[in-house]
Regions:
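Strongly charged, low-complexity linkers/loops
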Residues: 126, 132-144
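Ferredoxin-type iron-sulfur electron-transfer modules and their immediate structural context
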Residues: 1-124, 128-130, 159, 163-186
């Protein structure tokens, strides 16, 4: 299924440019780099929506990001090919459609990434250290979770200081019971 690897909603990314021409991600990427300070994130013009023949992806007007309707997605890859920033990735659905992934593609160093987007991966490496299955690598200041190695333990999600690691289609976590010892920091 297609996953959108950007969580830079309108609230998370400061606007730095405004363009009143044709709304196209391809045009935005080639002419002016988009309206936000993140040079890696979603451009928000919807080329992915136009490319989808199955009506499986739509732009959320509140967040400015595309959302995938998993019940309609055939994982054909048309949306991924249409994205000039390569933020859409085709991933296996996993057990009960559960997935854990890094919802960011920003390769800037921590402080620069955080300035461009408040929920960007800062490359701290906490997720790499806590993963018991060696499913996470850190390359070019960005964490990546290998879907073939990930066992969905979600320890990485717990330690991510930016909230960039997303776990989809899992039941809610059980609340901690009173007197339960806090988990050690990684």
């Amino acid at each position: 299924v297609a996953v959108v690897r950007c969580n830079g909603t309108c609230a998370n990314r400061p606007r730095v440019n405004q363009y009143d021409g044709a709304k196209s991600c391809a045009i935005a990427a080639s002419l002016y780099g988009g309206e936000t300070g993140c040079s890696f994130g979603c451009l928000g013009c919807g080329d992915c929506v136009t490319a989808c023949q199955f009506d499986a992806i739509h732009m959320n007007p509140e967040t400015g990001l595309p959302e995938v309707d998993e019940s309609k997605c055939t994982a054909c890859g048309a949306c991924a090919k249409a994205c000039p920033r390569n933020i859409i990735e085709i991933r296996p659905q996993g057990k009960k459609s559960r997935r854990v992934y890094v919802q960011c593609v920003n390769k800037d160093k921590g402080a620069v990434a955080r300035k461009a987007c408040t929920v960007a991966c800062i490359g701290c490496g906490k997720c790499v250290k806590v993963c018991p299955f060696e499913a996470i690598t850190l390359e070019n200041n960005l964490a990546y979770i290998d879907p073939n190695k990930c066992k969905s333990c979600r320890k990485c999600e717990e330690v991510c200081p930016q909230g960039t690691i997303i776990a989809l289609n899992f039941p809610p976590r059980k609340p901690k019971t009173e007197g339960e010892a806090p988990k050690a920091e990684a």
